[in-house]
Amino acid sequence: MFNLIQHIEHEQMKNLPAFRPGDSVEVKVWVVEGSKKRLQSFEGMIIAIRNRGLHSAFTVRKISNGEGVERVFQMHSPIIESITVKRCGFVRKAKLYYLRKRTGKAARIKERISS
Protein backbone atom coordinates (compact mmCIF):
# COMPACT_ATOMS: atom_id res chain seq x y z
CA MET A 1 0.00 0.00 0.00
CA PHE A 2 2.76 2.44 0.97
CA ASN A 3 4.69 1.71 -2.24
CA LEU A 4 1.58 2.48 -4.29
CA ILE A 5 1.16 5.87 -2.60
CA GLN A 6 4.85 6.61 -3.09
CA HIS A 7 4.62 5.67 -6.77
CA ILE A 8 1.60 7.93 -7.38
CA GLU A 9 3.24 10.86 -5.54
CA HIS A 10 6.46 10.39 -7.53
CA GLU A 11 4.51 10.67 -10.81
CA GLN A 12 3.03 14.02 -9.67
CA MET A 13 6.43 15.60 -8.92
CA LYS A 14 7.95 18.18 -11.27
CA ASN A 15 11.58 18.60 -12.30
CA LEU A 16 12.61 21.86 -10.63
CA PRO A 17 15.88 23.78 -10.69
CA ALA A 18 18.12 23.47 -7.62
CA PHE A 19 17.67 26.42 -5.26
CA ARG A 20 18.47 27.14 -1.61
CA PRO A 21 17.57 29.76 0.98
CA GLY A 22 19.19 33.07 0.10
CA ASP A 23 18.71 32.59 -3.65
CA SER A 24 16.79 35.21 -5.62
CA VAL A 25 14.17 33.56 -7.80
CA GLU A 26 11.39 34.46 -10.21
CA VAL A 27 8.29 32.30 -9.91
CA LYS A 28 5.75 32.44 -12.75
CA VAL A 29 2.28 31.46 -11.55
CA TRP A 30 -0.99 30.95 -13.42
CA VAL A 31 -3.68 33.33 -12.11
CA VAL A 32 -7.38 33.01 -12.99
CA GLU A 33 -9.34 36.27 -13.10
CA GLY A 34 -12.94 35.66 -14.07
CA SER A 35 -12.81 33.65 -17.28
CA LYS A 36 -9.27 34.75 -18.21
CA LYS A 37 -6.09 32.93 -17.29
CA ARG A 38 -2.72 34.71 -17.28
CA LEU A 39 0.84 34.35 -15.98
CA GLN A 40 1.90 36.45 -13.02
CA SER A 41 5.53 36.86 -11.98
CA PHE A 42 6.65 36.96 -8.34
CA GLU A 43 10.33 37.78 -7.88
CA GLY A 44 12.08 37.74 -4.52
CA MET A 45 14.41 35.91 -2.15
CA ILE A 46 13.81 32.44 -0.76
CA ILE A 47 13.71 32.67 3.03
CA ALA A 48 12.54 29.13 3.85
CA ILE A 49 12.17 25.69 2.28
CA ARG A 50 10.02 22.89 3.69
CA ASN A 51 11.00 19.50 2.22
CA ARG A 52 8.13 17.00 2.48
CA GLY A 53 8.22 15.12 -0.82
CA LEU A 54 5.15 15.98 -2.87
CA HIS A 55 4.02 18.41 -0.16
CA SER A 56 7.23 20.48 -0.22
CA ALA A 57 6.92 24.25 -0.07
CA PHE A 58 9.10 27.33 -0.19
CA THR A 59 8.61 30.92 0.97
CA VAL A 60 9.60 33.87 -1.22
CA ARG A 61 9.94 37.40 0.19
CA LYS A 62 10.06 40.64 -1.76
CA ILE A 63 9.73 44.33 -0.98
CA SER A 64 6.84 45.95 -2.86
CA ASN A 65 6.26 49.71 -2.45
CA GLY A 66 8.22 49.70 0.81
CA GLU A 67 6.21 46.83 2.30
CA GLY A 68 7.50 43.29 2.76
CA VAL A 69 5.42 40.69 0.91
CA GLU A 70 5.83 36.96 1.51
CA ARG A 71 4.23 34.20 -0.47
CA VAL A 72 4.36 30.46 0.17
CA PHE A 73 4.39 28.23 -2.92
CA GLN A 74 3.85 24.48 -3.07
CA MET A 75 6.82 23.16 -5.08
CA HIS A 76 4.94 20.67 -7.23
CA SER A 77 1.76 22.72 -7.65
CA PRO A 78 0.17 22.80 -11.11
CA ILE A 79 -0.27 26.59 -10.90
CA ILE A 80 3.52 27.10 -11.01
CA GLU A 81 4.62 27.50 -14.62
CA SER A 82 8.35 27.99 -14.00
CA ILE A 83 10.97 28.84 -11.38
CA THR A 84 14.06 30.74 -12.50
CA VAL A 85 17.08 31.27 -10.23
CA LYS A 86 18.32 34.84 -10.78
CA ARG A 87 21.08 35.04 -8.17
CA CYS A 88 22.64 32.57 -5.72
CA GLY A 89 23.05 33.85 -2.17
CA PHE A 90 25.56 32.65 0.42
CA VAL A 91 23.92 32.03 3.82
CA ARG A 92 24.64 29.70 6.72
CA LYS A 93 21.09 29.25 7.96
CA ALA A 94 18.18 27.23 6.62
CA LYS A 95 15.51 29.75 7.63
CA LEU A 96 16.12 33.44 6.99
CA TYR A 97 13.27 34.83 9.10
CA TYR A 98 15.64 37.43 10.57
CA LEU A 99 15.41 39.30 7.24
CA ARG A 100 11.86 40.34 8.18
CA LYS A 101 13.27 42.79 10.73
CA ARG A 102 15.90 44.22 8.36
CA THR A 103 15.40 46.84 5.67
CA GLY A 104 17.54 48.37 2.96
CA LYS A 105 21.23 47.51 2.85
CA ALA A 106 21.04 45.51 6.09
CA ALA A 107 18.89 42.92 4.28
CA ARG A 108 21.53 42.21 1.61
CA ILE A 109 23.09 38.76 1.26
CA LYS A 110 26.48 37.92 -0.23
CA GLU A 111 26.55 36.12 -3.55
CA ARG A 112 27.61 32.48 -3.63
CA ILE A 113 30.46 31.81 -6.01
CA SER A 114 29.77 28.52 -7.75
CA SER A 115 32.67 26.64 -9.28
Swiss-Prot record:
Gene3D superfamilies, sorted: 2.30.30.790
GO terms of biological process kind: translation
Molecular function GO labels: structural constituent of ribosome
Keywords from the named record: Ribonucleoprotein, Ribosomal protein
Keyword Heme applies: no
InterPro entries registered for this protein in UniProt: Ribosomal_bL19, Ribosomal_bL19_sf, Translation_prot_SH3-like_sf
GO cellular component, one term: cytosolic large ribosomal subunit
Similarity comment: Belongs to the bacterial ribosomal protein bL19 family.
Reported function: This protein is located at the 30S-50S ribosomal subunit interface and may play a role in the structure and function of the aminoacyl-tRNA binding site.
Record protein name field: Large ribosomal subunit protein bL19
Organism placement in taxonomy: Bacteria, Pseudomonadati, Pseudomonadota, Gammaproteobacteria, Candidatus Palibaumannia
UniProt gene name: rplS
